[in-house]
Amino acid sequence: MTATLKKPTHALRVLHTSDWHLGKRLYGQQRYDEFSEFLDWLVDAINHNDVDVLIVAGDVFDTMTPSNRAQELYYRFLGQVAKSCCRHVIITAGNHDSPTFLDAPKSILNALNIKVIGMVSHDIDDELLLLHHQNKPEAIVIAVPYLRDKDIRESSNFDDLKSKEHDTFMGIAKHYDTLSEHAKKLQQDIFEKFHKKIPIIATGHLFVAGSQISSKDDGMRDLYVGTLGQIPSGIFDPAIDYVALGHIHASQKVAKCEHIRYCGSPMAMGFGEVGKDKQVLIIDFEDTSPAVQSLCVPVFQQLIQISGDWQHINDALNELLKNNANAWVEIIYTGQELRPHLTDDIRQQLAGSCVLALNIQNRTLYQKSMDSQPKLLNLKQLSETDVFEQLLNQKSISEQERPLLKNAYQTLLANIHTHDHLEK
């Protein structure tokens, strides 16, 4: 049953969500059923709560080349929400999305009052949206997608780190400043004509300084080389009444500001997020002041993390089997015994049940192998950065040389992850 939040009379109601990552797998396991249930729930939440504006702040898909099934879920949802009470849908691209893929059907979607902003445009009006209801303006939206390096910096070569950080910050700040100035002028013009001050809402897909990452395995990627967490909240003009952010998967206020928010991902993207509430945000504007409430998203697939010795793991699994649980589990063995057949033992124990062990880590055996064979590494447990760190260690690279090499490597990674393969 979808919860219903009381809506003030004459208020403009906005629903803020982000980071769906449609098509994302968890240790190879498809999650389409979960995504489908979430999107069905979201349509119900929109209708039950009389939502006027839906904002999706980036990372609609998990990859730039989404599967046919992921695309089907996306377009089915848009078809459903177009028939709902929601008057306006605004979707901006995140760093996982292909800007050209999202933008491709925008002309058709415009006819359904669905505005898609996949990439930065030279035309300021493409990112500055004026929303109307009954032929009267009701809100201004500064709809900014993820700003790629080429959008905000003239140079993309291997500059020194400080110059790159400075140029990145200045590029982002300039982009928001330009849009904010136009939005404020538009707001004033509307006030003079209609004698009503309407709210200014901005979107962003970036990492603002002081924000807290939900976990190390939630699928987030570094956005800007060397500047992770260094984009200050001060880039948002004080005239902006609400900032709808995406990228970070934990719902939170930014810099203790009630009006600058990450809504977080609606589903746990990794076992590190187990037990953390997932939500979308409801924002009511009776004038230009936002009143923010959260709406909890149900858990559509139970995820469980079990860590400890064999006795603890065995007891926990037996309890799940006893309760006929339908759960996906991650098991981390940290006992004193080596237990080389741990994976086989667990698979046999769970055979025929609805408990699925997606990831089994034998930390004890792994550490023993590391002690006896330092070069034996489990790539499954290493990030791209960890692999490069191991290479630097193997080559005995000095501490003085490492920052420049890491900077170059991160630049290459960023280019790989943000290159739009559909762009001509």
Q: Where are the language model's segments positioned?
A:
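A short helix->loop->beta-strand "cap" motif at the edges of active sites that frequently abuts
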Residues: 83-89, 198, 258
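A conserved active-site cap/scaffold subdomain adjacent to cofactor or substrate pockets
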Residues: 233-299
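N-terminal active-site segment of His-dependent metallophosphoesterases
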Residues: 1-79, 86, 202, 407, ...
